[in-house]
């Protein structure tokens, strides 16, 4: 650490090129940070621990704008905490993405006319690891381009040795607690990938389909005869599943059918007799009020079947073809079978109606085909005990969601949960640590425990031999675990768990902040809290910052399918990483809000990011200006001067600096990152660059004929310049790390390995705060803007110097104006500046002048004899006439009730705003015309 004071070495302005090269600068500092281990923390180092484990991107992935947004938010928080003196660990890693990788590899094999079983498991996994090593580093390299201040030496991969050990340990412990079981249940089955898929891997798509109505004949009975009913009619979007129907359900309160409950129907095409059952979950007002029940192929039907102890008849194979239970339709693809069933029902006169029907169909995100609810023997985690534990923590406020509205979503998920299917019929992933007992020689029947769960194969063999004898043989389950199982352990497995004595676990667990999108609260955030609750008895993070989506300029969600995604690397190459990061964070209106990012596809440009690049250029040029004026180092630390010697402009900028310091730190602390970016932008661009640098230019002159007071004033100006710029760069560092690192080194002249990223946050001197002075300077700047505006109205040439009168009855403002009279004259090209009280202004002789008012200040610009008054009057009268016509037009539209009631709300509001603006314009022009009389 170094103290931020004037150093013995200072770069000349030539140390910074005239133009800013963002890509070159960023590459250089990213390399320096990593080579010097700038972000590699020591667990024993001082400072309160602060840790973040980044959401692991898929190893198959490539950088998209969501990654860039997430990175910008996380790294802003992390870099700020480092500046505040915390012992920070930001740990990176990637996810093995089992389905995604396996899909890619199987596609490659298919092109070669092979499949994974042709290779065998060992060869297939060898090929998968080769692919991962070759292609999997792309996303990491791209993340590095974003300037992530993570410890790359601690980078983890969900299939690496340590995490694999943690996964096996977690599985064994959950099984020992009775929280993992093996059972038959309906799962989302993807026929294309040949595996169960999680709910997250299912995408609901609106499909134009049909609703087919057909009849089930009643088996004749006294009840049916009395009611003169010979059939029940049902409707379905999936007629092929009727081959597995085991009942038809009606609502027991439905007067039409309640007397038929317990009667029998004949299942068409199959001939099976099935019962009519009563179930209160049937909506008697939907359709015919009769629902076909297929427990083996529909989740709702499965629940009905469980309640009524109905059989489960599966009519499809895992490849999506019809099986032997489908009778004459065996071997047909499920969609071919659909058409065949419809034709057969039509042929026997039981098809009654076909209607167009738009409905949601679940598709496999990876396989891109409709998933099939299929009965399958899988491994499950009992979720109720886990969610109950999390609910107890939640009642204590753990974790805290930012914004708070997402806590309700999290709580609702905890209270509406079903057991989690964790097995996948894949080879790439964490193989389930369970071994089936397949044979023994002592003729004892092995039925009480058909499998052994263990951490390793050796442990499994030992347990099996102890239970079944030395000759027992075991074979490991072929399936792998759902990727979300290992992801659920991410916050603590990456820190050394299950070894809770590991220095990283001891120092940085629980972690502090998780930054993620709202779309995986269900699937990742909640599973992490559940896993942490059961294994560490603590929540894995204190805060969960939920960010929104990146949308395009038309407010559409960015996605590949919509064709409106933007490649972050393209914008990085054009504008720089810092410009992109700053633009993304600055667009955040509030925590959790979506942001918009424009993009001109023809020119490959973004006005939003370009504005941030322009801001970077502004800072670059301001620092070059500072270096030119600070290179002689004839100034001291600001604290060494008598504060009474500071000019009002110095006190004003130091007051603004103190306030911005306090506000920025508070905003960073409370995740108001967008507000932090906006506040720093306004301070840097307006207060520092546009005003303070202009105000001190005349004080920085290098004349040798200066008095001792002038020399002291010059030194003070330089000291304030150094202080403000240095502190500004540090406060901006979390948002624009590369640029600020470069400029700060140029300013301080320190060695390259003394990083700004590791410096302390600047101290804020509350004694510098002076809100009255800030208010007066706001009025001062308003007067300068008004004078410039009046000069433009008068059509004065830039070289023309005219007198200016400033009228105010506010004593503090008068003092500020009087002290700054020379600055006003220079910045407005005034011949002379008079500061008058209202009483003094009244005693002035009548004159032709332009005037304007801003707050408690009136500006008068005498113009008689300087311009052609008649020409100006004519121009103003034209402006007045134009504004009055605009008022007439707008008033007419707003008086039209039909327009106000039927036009879009934003159009009406815009019309009202334009009317208000035009009315103000009329008043202003009239005032200016009066000044010419």
From Swiss-Prot:
Primary localization: cytoplasm
GO cellular component labels: cytosol
Keywords, comma-separated and alphabetical: Aminoacyl-tRNA synthetase, ATP-binding, Coiled coil, Cytoplasm, Ligase, Nucleotide-binding, Protein biosynthesis
Residue window of motif 'HIGH' region: 57-67
InterPro entries reported for this sequence: aa-tRNA-synth_I_CS, aa-tRNA-synth_Ia, Anticodon_Ia_Val, M/V/L/I-tRNA-synth_anticd-bd, Rossmann-like_a/b/a_fold, tRNA-bd_arm, tRNAsynth_Ia_anticodon-bd, Val-tRNA_synth_C_sf
SUPFAM superfamilies, sorted: Anticodon-binding domain of a subclass of class I aminoacyl-tRNA synthetases, Nucleotidylyl transferase, tRNA-binding arm, ValRS/IleRS/LeuRS editing domain
UniProt feature coiled coil, ranges: 866-932
Pfam families xref list: Anticodon_1, tRNA-synt_1, Val_tRNA-synt_C
Function in brief: Catalyzes the attachment of valine to tRNA(Val). As ValRS can inadvertently accommodate and process structurally similar amino acids such as threonine, to avoid such errors, it has a 'posttransfer' editing activity that hydrolyzes mischarged Thr-tRNA(Val) in a tRNA-dependent manner.
UniProt remark on domains: ValRS has two distinct active sites: one for aminoacylation and one for editing. The misactivated threonine is translocated from the active site to the editing site. The C-terminal coiled-coil domain is crucial for aminoacylation activity.
Similarity section: Belongs to the class-I aminoacyl-tRNA synthetase family. ValS type 1 subfamily.
Stated name of the protein: Valine--tRNA ligase
Organism the protein comes from: Prochlorococcus marinus (strain NATL2A)
């Amino acid at each position: 650490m170094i103290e931020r004071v004037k150093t013995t070495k200072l770069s000349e302005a030539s140390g910074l090129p005239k133009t800013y090269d963002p890509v070159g600068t960023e590459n250089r500092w990213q390399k320096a940070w990593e080579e010097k281990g700038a972000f590699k923390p020591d667990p024993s180092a001082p400072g309160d621990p602060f840790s973040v484990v980044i959401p692991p991107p898929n190893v198959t992935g490539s950088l998209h704008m969501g990654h860039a947004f997430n990175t910008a938010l996380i790294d802003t928080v992390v870099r700020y905490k480092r500046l505040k003196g915390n012992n920070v660990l930001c740990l990176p890693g990637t996810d093995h993405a089992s389905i995604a990788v396996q899909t890619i590899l199987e596609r490659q094999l298919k092109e070669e006319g092979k499949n994974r079983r042709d290779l065998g498991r060992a060869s297939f996994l060898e090929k998968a690891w080769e692919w991962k090593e070759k292609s999997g580093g792309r996303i990491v390299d791209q993340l590095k381009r974003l300037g992530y201040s993570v410890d790359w030496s601690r980078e983890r991969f969900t299939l690496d040795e340590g995490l694999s050990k943690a996964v096996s340990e977690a599985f064994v412990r959950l099984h020992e607690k009775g929280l993992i079981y093996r059972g038959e249940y309906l799962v989302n089955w993807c026929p294309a990938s040949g595996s169960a898929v999680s709910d997250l891997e299912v995408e609901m798509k609106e499909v134009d389909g049909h609703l087919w109505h057909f009849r089930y004949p009643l088996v004749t009975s006294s009840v049916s005869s009395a009611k003169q009913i010979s059939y029940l009619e049902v409707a379905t979007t999936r007629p092929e599943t009727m081959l597995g129907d085991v009942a038809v359900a009606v609502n027991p309160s439905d007067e039409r059918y309640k007397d038929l409950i317990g009667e029998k129907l004949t299942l068409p095409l199959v001939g099976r007799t099935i019962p009519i059952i009563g179930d209160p979950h049937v909506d008697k007002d939907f359709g015919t009020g009769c629902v076909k029940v297929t427990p083996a192929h529909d989740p709702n039907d499965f629940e009905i079947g469980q309640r009524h102890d109905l059989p489960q008849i599966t009519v499809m194979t895992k490849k999506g073809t019809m099986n032997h239970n489908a009778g004459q339709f065996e071997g047909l693809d499920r969609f071919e079978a659909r058409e065949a069933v419809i034709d057969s029902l039509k042929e026997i006169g039981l098809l009654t109606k076909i209607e167009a029907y738009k409905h949601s169909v679940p598709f496999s995100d990876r396989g891109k085909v409709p998933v099939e609810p299929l009965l399958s023997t899988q491994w499950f985690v009992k979720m109720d005990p886990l969610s109950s534990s999390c609910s107890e923590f939640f009642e204590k406020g753990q974790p805290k969601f930012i914004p708070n509205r997402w806590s309700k979503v999290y709580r609702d998920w905890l209270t509406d949960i079903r057991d989690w299917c964790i097995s996948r019929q894949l080879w790439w992933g964490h193989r389930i640590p369970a071994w089936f007992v397949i044979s023994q020689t002592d003729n004892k029947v092995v039925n009480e425990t058909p499998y052994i769960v263990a951490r390793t194969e050796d442990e499994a063999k030992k347990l099996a031999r102890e239970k079944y004898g030395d000759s027992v043989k075991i074979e490991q389950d072929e399936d792998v675990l759902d990727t979300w199982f290992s992801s659920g352990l991410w916050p603590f497995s990456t820190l050394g768990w299950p070894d809770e004595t590991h220095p990283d676990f001891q120092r940085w667990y629980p972690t502090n902040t998780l930054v993620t999108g709202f779309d995986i609260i269900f699937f990742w955030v909640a599973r992490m809290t559940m896993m942490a609750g059961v294994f560490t008895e603590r929540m894995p993070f204190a805060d969960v910052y939920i960010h929104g989506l990146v949308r395009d300029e038309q407010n559409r969600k960015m996605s590949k399918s919509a064709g409106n995604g933007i490649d972050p690397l393209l914008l990085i190459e054009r504008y720089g990483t810092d410009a992109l990061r700053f633009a993304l964070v600055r667009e955040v209106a509030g925590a959790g809000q979506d942001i918009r990012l424009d993009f001109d596809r023809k020119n490959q440009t973004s006005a939003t990011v370009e504005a941030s690049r322009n801001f970077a250029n502004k800072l670059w040029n301001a620092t070059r200006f500072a270096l030119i004026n600070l290179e002689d180092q004839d100034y001291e630390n600001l604290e060494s001067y008598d504060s009474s010697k500071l000019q009002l402009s110095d006190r004003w900028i130091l007051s603004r600096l103190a306030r911005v310091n306090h506000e920025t730190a508070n905003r960073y602390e409370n995740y108001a990152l967008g507000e932090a970016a906006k506040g720093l932008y306004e301070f840097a661009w307006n207060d520092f660059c546009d005003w303070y640098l202009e105000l001190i230019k005349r004080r920085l002159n290098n004349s040798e004929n200066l008095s001792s007071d002038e020399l002291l004033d010059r030194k003070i100006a330089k000291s304030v310049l150094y202080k403000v710029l240095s502190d500004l760069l540090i406060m901006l560092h979390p948002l624009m790390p590369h640029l600020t690192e470069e400029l700060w080194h140029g300013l301080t002249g320190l060695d390259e390995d003394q990083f700004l990223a590791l410096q302390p946050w600047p101290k804020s001197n509350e004694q510098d705060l002076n809100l009255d002075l800030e208010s007066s300077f706001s009025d001062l700047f308003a007067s300068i803007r008004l004078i410039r505006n009046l000069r433009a109205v008068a059509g004065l040439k830039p070289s023309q110097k005219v007198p200016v009168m400033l009228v105010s009855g506010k004593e503090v403002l008068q003092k500020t104006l009087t002290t700054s009279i020379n600055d006003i004259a220079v910045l407005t090209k005034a011949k002379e500046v008079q500061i008058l009280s209202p009483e003094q202004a009244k005693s002035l002789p009548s004159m032709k002048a332009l005037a304007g008012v801003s707050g408690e200040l009136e500006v008068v610009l005498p113009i008689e004899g300087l311009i052609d008054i008649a020409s100006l009057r004519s121009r103003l009268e034209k402006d007045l006439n134009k504004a009055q016509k605009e008022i007439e037009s707008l008033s007419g539209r707003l008086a039209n009730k039909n327009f106000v009631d039927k036009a879009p709300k934003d159009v009406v509001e815009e019309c009202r705003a334009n009317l208000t603006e035009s009315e103000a314009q009329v008043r202003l022009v009239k005032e200016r015309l009066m000044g010419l009389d």
